[in-house]
Amino acid sequence: MATIEGIVAREILDSRGNPTVEVEVGLDDGTIARAAVPSGASTGAFEAIELRDGDKDRYLGKGVATAVSNIEDKIVDELIGYEASEQRLIDQKMLDIDGTDNKSELGANAILGVSLAVAKAAADSAELTLYRYLGGPNAHLLPVPMMNILNGGAHADSNVDIQEFMIAPIGAPTFREALRSGAEVYHALKSVLKKKDLATGLGDEGGFAPNLPTNAAALDLIAEAVEKAGYRLGTDIVFALDVAATEFFANGTYTFEGAAKTAEEMSSYYTKLADAYPIVSIEDPLAEDDWSGWQTLTASVGDRIQIVGDDLFVTNPQRIARGIAEHAANAVLVKVNQIGSLTETLDAVDLAHRAGFRCMMSHRSGETEDTTIADLAVATGCGQIKTGAPARSDRVAKYNQLLRIEEELADAARYAGAGAFPRYRSA
């Protein structure tokens, strides 16, 4: 196998106009591969550390020149000569160099950039697609796209508390048809909003961001859009939410729709919402440290709804193991930059799957044209991907990559569809 001959790092811009890290890895057989690192807006307290410069005179303190320098000065020389196929050894070497539990010395953005670029280079050198290189011969399942078509919370300048209102086209026969139906509902929603004189400006992830009287009003608008687009709600298309509850949790209470609520009251709200709407998945319904609340909600509705831990788990195997042991949540959101290396991400997915937890591959609100997570979704067979609305190049780049993968797989391709949500039963 080809060995690492050179590594180049640079500062580029993400979809929010903030700097992020891009890395190129060159091998001795002439292969060159590139990877860019995403960045979140609502971040969990237990995520690996994304290193920012803090120099207010440069990119308002958000520069990543230090992370780039760490790659050039502390990582490059240590990895020259490694076989690119030795992903686990390479990732472990970077963790050893860093020497911290949260990657605060080198920066998770530095480590991840190198980790992903190495994997891409190894795949290219082996003349394999990334999903086939990582997933082997059984990588054939196309994920359900969880399209965030109405944005609130930290992703939008609106009064809507819930961060993401998503549609999942579970009734489509193929990924291509799922993407088409999602795009048609997205455009229908814009028409519905305009007809009601509601704002059609976009949030960070390409979804519309109107001010609304209640969070349930968002679901009513999307339901109208689904019908307008000619689809059946609950059968063709279902709902999913990312509440990001940590964002409105303080001093033991949740400030939701203008009122202070307990974990029990929030759980009751979600139960009623699930009774009224075809919701298959709720992400981060409670705060990242409210373990007892998570246990109660999972026991209450976990048999019929996917309860997803994002800030709760931060793609960290140790926190996922605790969630499994304590029956808190029944699914894991997977974000490569939360844990900060490819092998740790794959370990997290493996741990979740072995425990019967579902996994949802996810982007971040600050994205680039990098399509790695599309390949990862197929490689891991997770059956679900969350990468924003079917709009804006940073979002559709992932959807378009999945179209290419489905086309390449041809008759071997399978679309996850309703099978991705075994707990959900349509009315």
Swiss-Prot record:
GO biological process per UniProt: glycolytic process
Subcellular localization, per the record? Cytoplasm; Secreted; Cell surface
Q: Which GO terms describe its cellular component?
A: cell surface; extracellular region; phosphopyruvate hydratase complex
Keywords recorded for this protein, A-Z:
Cytoplasm, Glycolysis, Lyase, Magnesium, Metal-binding, Secreted
**UniProt xrefs under CDD domains:** enolase
What does the cofactor section's free text say about binding? Binds a second Mg(2+) ion via substrate during catalysis.
Q: In which pathway does it act?
A: Carbohydrate degradation; glycolysis; pyruvate from D-glyceraldehyde 3-phosphate: step 4/5
Q: Name one Pfam family in it.
A: Enolase_C
The catalysed reaction is: (2R)-2-phosphoglycerate = phosphoenolpyruvate + H2O
**Tell me, what does this protein do in biology?**
Catalyzes the reversible conversion of 2-phosphoglycerate (2-PG) into phosphoenolpyruvate (PEP). It is essential for the degradation of carbohydrates via glycolysis.
State the similarity comment: Belongs to the enolase family.
What is the protein's given name? Enolase
Q: Which organism is it from?
A: Salinispora arenicola (strain CNS-205)
